[in-house]
Every structure is written in C-alpha cells, then in structure tokens.
Amino acid sequence: MELDYLAQHLVELKNEYLSELHSHNHIREFIPVANHQNLFDKGLLEKLHTFFKYNKIYYKQQGLTLSNIPCISYEGGVNQFWVSSKKYETIYQPFLPTWGLSALVMILVAKDLGFENIIDIGSGDGRLIFCGSILGLNSIGVEIDKDLCDLQNKISNSSNVKYEVINGDSNSIDYSQFKLENTIIFISALPDSGEILSYGMLNHLKKYKAKLHNVGITLMGSHAYRRYSRDKSKWGWGKFIDDSGLKILKCISLPSSWTLDEKKETPYLFTLFKC
C-alpha cells in the first residue's frame, strides 16, 4: 500500500478511535487485529502486539471495531518515567511515546528511502528500534534514562526482537562506534526543546563528515507554533536544516501522543545530508 495513503488512512482511523473511546488516559492507541485487516503485513502487526504485551506502560486493553476493522485498544501511563527523568540534567523533553503504528509507518518510509540502519536518539521505550528490527534494519537506540533502557531490554528479551540499546547522553557518546552510512537518525524531540540536542549531535557528526554516506535525520516537527517560537519555518526546523546542510526528502504527518487531541497530526521530516 502506498505510504502516504496508509498514513492518511491511519489518521482517519485515529479520529474514529478518539470519538469511539472515552478515556481519561492520555496514553492510548490502537492496533488492528492482524488477521482481520489488509493495511499492514500480518506478521508485522503480530510482532507489534507483542511489543504492547510486554510493555509495562500499558495496563489496560479492550477490543473495538474501527471502519469494520477489529482492533485492540491499549491504554496506560508514563508518570513514573516523567518523575524518573528529573534525575537527568540534560533531558530536554519528557518521554511521551510515538504511536506504535506511526513508528511502523516511519520505518517503512525509511526503508523505502533506501536506509539500512537506524539510530534513535531519545529512544524512550524502544518502539522505533523495535519496528526497525522487525523490518530487517540494524537498529540502535540511545537513551539517557536507565529505567527506560531497562524497559527496552526487557521488551527485547521477552519478544525475542533484537536491537541494541545504549544507555547514555547523546551529546557525550562516541559516534565513531556507529556505522555512518545508509543510516537514518531519528531525533525524538519537538523543535523548541530539541534544538540543543540536535545541534549537539550535529557537532559530533561533523567530525566524521567523510563517513556520512547516505546519512539522514528524521525530525519531529510541529504544525502549530508557539507565540515565542524561535523558528517558524519548515515545521520549526528551518534554521537547523539550513545550518546542517540537509535537504528534505519527505514529510509525513502521523498520530502521536503529542498531538492526540489536536486537529493536526505530528509532521515527521525525513532529511538527507547534501553531498
């Protein structure tokens, strides 16, 4: 299925989901039952359900039907991780997960663009690298919060989906350890809060410029700008994109916990370093 159409269909299902499910839990999302849909590969969805099964963030699930597609709704909370994150001075944005289906679509986009490796900066509970692994990409997550790293490893061991988890600060780790070719780097932070993180990572990558063969960055943008936002171009990332020498390959808007109750979704910008 064409990925832009898939993303739009996911947004339509999300809107129906929010109108059908009356819940006070901010962490809530759905996954279609694998055998009763034709949107995603059956095996991928079965694996994605195991991610939620072994993820202690989610403590409630129930069945519902969206556009004649049987689905499972998963609800939970991240308060314990918000409290835990206060231990770290260099956390610029609290953990709030990307939707599982959105993560799957993003990895499908990355694969369609020809990337073979992913590095997720601020990998949270590991859903992006989980999806990367089940789609055959070499997947590495960098997360400063040890509790979230422990959760990622538990999910990996329980589901038998393998990926690498690095517990560390993205501004101080050694980037020479990574395979910096055919690699897409995800920055899981909104424009205003992710600026320091992004420029810090960029300074490290500049040291290995000769190795950056087909390397890109995926940025989480915003359709809505705050009154005092420093950058109101290119979904909040215009200056960083220009300073970094990046070109935009694709922008796709997908549901996330950040925009759950808003009319517009979260735009994800897939970019590539210019030669």
Region spans (language model):
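Conserved SAM-binding loop of SAM-dependent methyltransferases across substrates and taxa
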Residues: 127-137
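A short SAM/SAH-binding and catalytic strip from SAM-dependent methyltransferases
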Residues: 182-198
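Conserved SAM-binding motif I beta-strand of class I
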Residues: 138-143
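C-terminal substrate-binding/active-site "lid" region of AdoMet-derived donor-dependent transferases
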Residues: 196-265
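S-adenosyl-L-methionine
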Residues: 2-113, 153-179
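Conserved class I S-adenosyl-L-methionine
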Residues: 114-124
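Short alpha-helix immediately C-terminal to the canonical SAM-binding loop
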Residues: 149-150
